[in-house]
C-alpha cells in the first residue's frame, strides 16, 4: 500500500503519522504553509517538491497537488506537496493588500526554499521541484535565485534544486505576454506597476549558466497563460547552455496537472515524457 506520510514522520523517526507538517513551526515566521509527503516503497529515486498553481492567489490542491504526489510516489519518487503562501481569495476580491499587507513576494519563494531545506536535511539524494502554472514560475524562480536565502535560515543547506519541471508556466512579469492575475498575486496590490519588480521577477531575464536541468512543457492552445511565456524561457535556457527539454503540444489547454479526466491525446503523454527525461539527466550538483 502506498504510504502517505509527512516530513514530520521523517524528522521524528516515529511511527506516528500526520498528513501535514507546518514548515515554519518553531520559528518566528507566522505562516500556515505546509508540506505533505507521498513516499514510495523502498529507496526513492529522487525527491520532488510539488508546487500547485493558482495565479499566486489560490492553489489547485488536487489535480496539481495530491494527484501529482500520488503519481510520483507510484513511480518511485518521494513527492512533497507544498501548500505555499498565496494572496488568497479575500485579497483577490477586495484588493486589500495595498493597505493592510498580506502574502506577496518573497513569501512564496521563501516557502519553497524552506521546503527544499527541510527535505535536504533528511535526504541526501537529488532534490528537485515541479510546478504548474504560477507554481511553474515558483520552481523556476528557485532554479535562478538560489544564491539568495529568502528564508534566512538555510544555514549552509544548498538551495539550488537538482532539477526543475515547470509545467505550462507563468514566466514573464512583463507585458504583453504576462499572466496579469499571477503578476498581481505575486507582487501584491500597489506593486504591480513597479517596472523594477516586474523585471526582477521576469524569469527569462535571469537564467544562469549553472541553473539546474529543466523539463519545460507548454500547449499551443493554452487559454490561460500565453504559451509565449514558455518560448521566452526556452530561448533563455538555450542561450545560457542550460540542459533542458521542451515539450510542445498542439492541443492540451491549461490546468490538467495529473488529472486524467482533463488530458487530451497529447497531454496524456506528458508524465511518461517526464519520466524518460529524468532517467537521462545529469543532476550535476553545484
Language-model features and meaning:
Residues 33-36, 91-98, 231-286:
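C-terminal catalytic histidine-bearing segment of alpha/beta-hydrolase fold enzymes
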Residues 19-43:
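N-terminal cap/lid segment of alpha/beta-hydrolase-fold proteins
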Residues 60-67, 83-124, 263-267:
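Catalytic nucleophile-loop/oxyanion-hole region of alpha/beta-hydrolase
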